[in-house]
Amino acid sequence: MFLLYEYDIFWAFLIISSLIPILAFLISGVLAPISEGPEKLSSYESGIEPMGDAWLQFRIRYYMFALVFVVFDVETVFLYPWAMSFDVLGVSVFIEALIFVLIPIIGSVYAWRKGALEWS
């Protein structure tokens, strides 16, 4: 039989965990000093006053290389536990890991062929 009172702890936890961030934002908004001036409106460049416009545009190529790096970095994070327990796991897990490695490699070869990784 479904008893609703068994979930009292869950609802209490949900309400308390929702109220803590709300209270933190409200308290910081009340206690934070409000001071706006030219120092607050200028960008901070390693203690040096910026010359010219502080908003520079980056080439999209930097983001493409960063994205490829993040994909392979995350793949390494997922492959590490598999490598540590390689001797316990069977052949089927090895095939799954091989497929897991081949998918980003195929994607990288495709991006390379399309010219997404070319610098010029």
From Swiss-Prot:
It is an enzyme of class 7 (translocase). It catalyses: a plastoquinone + NADH + (n+1) H(+)(in) = a plastoquinol + NAD(+) + n H(+)(out); a plastoquinone + NADPH + (n+1) H(+)(in) = a plastoquinol + NADP(+) + n H(+)(out). One of its GO terms (biological process) is photosynthesis, light reaction. GO terms for molecular function: NADH dehydrogenase (ubiquinone) activity; quinone binding. It holds the Pfam family Oxidored_q4. The keyword Membrane applies. It is found in: Plastid, Chloroplast thylakoid membrane. GO terms for cellular component: chloroplast thylakoid membrane; NADH dehydrogenase complex. Keywords: Chloroplast, Membrane, NAD, NADP, Plastid, Plastoquinone, Quinone, Thylakoid, Translocase, Transmembrane, Transmembrane helix, Transport. It comes from the Eukaryota. It is a multi-pass membrane protein. The chain crosses the membrane at residues 9-29, 64-84, 88-108. Its main location: plastid. Its EC number is 7.1.1.-. Belongs to the complex I subunit 3 family. PANTHER family: NADH-UBIQUINONE OXIDOREDUCTASE CHAIN 3. NDH is composed of at least 16 different subunits, 5 of which are encoded in the nucleus. NDH shuttles electrons from NAD(P)H:plastoquinone, via FMN and iron-sulfur (Fe-S) centers, to quinones in the photosynthetic chain and possibly in a chloroplast respiratory chain. The immediate electron acceptor for the enzyme in this species is believed to be plastoquinone. Couples the redox reaction to proton translocation, and thus conserves the redox energy in a proton gradient. This is NAD(P)H-quinone oxidoreductase subunit 3, chloroplastic. It comes from Drimys granadensis. The lineage of its organism: Eukaryota, Viridiplantae, Streptophyta, Embryophyta, Tracheophyta. The gene is ndhC.
